[in-house]
Amino acid sequence: MGLKLNKGSSIRLAKDDDNLSEVTIGCSWGEDGHNIDVDAMVFFSDDRSKYRLVDLVYYGNREEGRLYVKHYGDDTTGSNKQHASDNEVIFLRLDKIPERITSVAVVLNAYTGEKLSLVPNLRCRVYSGKPGEVQDVLGTFDINDKKSLTTTSVLVGYFEKDSVNEWSFRAVGEALKAHRVEQLKNVFNTPKNIDIQNDYNTGPVESKVTIWGFIKRLFS
């Protein structure tokens, strides 16, 4: 089952003090009766260059020869469990991710435009090993906070590489006010800024910060 993650929880991606090279993010949800098409996607960013978006992988832009990531397909109804309990699965080779990439955000997006609150039992788990070959479930995050599901997209969490090239995963569970792929790309690509006070109702803060700046503040 692994560690049950809450908002802000962080897990180190290592086993017996050795860094893991292969991890999988598996996301699951129930059938909703509304034919809502939920998509799992990952955004690769270079935060040493002010969080510039480097790569994006989702159902419409899968592995295409990349050595470090593979998206295992699109479940359009919530009824197609690909690997055990997962509807959509993304596999990462952490040791093959280009050095300049330091953050990998995991997002769930309702392609058909409905609020995610209509989708039951949203859950993501991080485990070591390839899809279908689970070694250890490292953490499971149930995304059931209604404030996180008021829009069509939610930032599930992110993988982050530190200064000594060790990776960790942090659960976030924050709603994103973006729907289409191009809108989501803008969220994760500076110099595009977001108005945190208006968009996220977090109270007085500096008027403009990047999405990554916002995330760091939540858990600093």
What function would you assign to each model-found segment?
Residues 1-219:
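Intrinsic-disorder/low-complexity signal
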